[in-house]
Amino acid sequence: MPCGLRAIHMPSSSPVVYLGYQIAAGSRDERENEEGLAHFCEHMTFKGTERRSAWNILNCLEAVGGSLNAYTTKECTVFYAAVPEHYTRRAVDLLTDIVFHSTYPQKEIGKEVEVICDEIESYNDSPADLIYDDFENIVFHGHPLGHNILGTTERVRSFTTADALRFTSRLYTPSNAVFFMYGGKKLPTIPIGSATLAEPRLQKTAISSASLFSAAGVTTRDKGTHQAHVMLGSPSYGASNDLLRERMSLYLLNNIIGGRGMNSRLNVTLREHRGLVYTVESSMTTYGDTGLWCTYLGCDKGDVRRCLRLVRHELDKFMDEPLSERRLNAAKKQLRGQLTIDCDNRENFALDLGSVYLFRDKARDVEKTCKEIDAVTAEDIQRVARHIFEPSKMTTLIYK
């Protein structure tokens, strides 16, 4: 579009349309003294525009059975809706209005701040959730990627209309956003004035590899919880295309080690065989310029050392010898099946469609992803394991 907005549409015969805006504006884009501002702006975007009240925004789609929602990550903010196809135009108009014309009225801030502060306190009461952010704060210390997305209650209470307008005028621009739509026969006209000038896409503050994981080692925090919560992890791969082979190898390896299947190596070793944990899982997070692989587990405080030894033993196996062809093929089959089932969740598929287009300028292609998984070899898995699971690169955080 002349204004710089990118749009992607995947038609569907379904009577429901999923659509929205993905904006490259997350907590990593916050400047000094702005921690939590991206999430604050997400909340306040629903509180009024130049021509809509908060009540009108709330009721606009719900009156016809639709839904309106949003979320903030470290790299983007997403506003999205689901509506019967007949009301697609209504949803497009509303989403465009709140994203590009919100006024963030001061009279609404006082009420919404209390909602956000309750969200922060609720999050702080959940160590199984909090430890993930605390871990990234250690890993990315000194960089906005290390900030908690929600911010602190003290900081959030200080935000004003001027703060929200300053942040969104810098980042909520057509050239920094993608409009996505899954469903319907054709992409509707998006009501952004032609006078809106296209601007170059914003460049993020890149992280140099030398600055990653300077805090490698063990950190213990006394949380006074009944159960111990443990995170360990190391740097991994960013979204760069020249790391595609490594990223897909780690994607498969992560699913084998601690993916969502009950047959994951760590779940079988720690839970099924020994009954040491209720939850153990691993994950890989891919940012534009860096990445993170980590494992989380919850166990009795007296079992922490034993659990860590068992995790280390499993990681060493992948470093020491390649997977057999039978196990590798079984792992690929499982992951391909999971991806296929994921595609049946239409809302999540729509959100992924927008996310991939925002950051990679291409449509989501599950068939291509499955082919990339099939191309991974046992030697690829072992090479990536030796790189990611190197003990000297590991950071460990323990809540007791």
Identify what each model region corresponds to:
Residues 1-56, 165-269, 308-312, 393-400:
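His/Glu-rich zincin catalytic helix
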Residues 54-204, 220, 236, 258, ...:
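Charge-rich, well-structured scaffold segments of protease-associated domains
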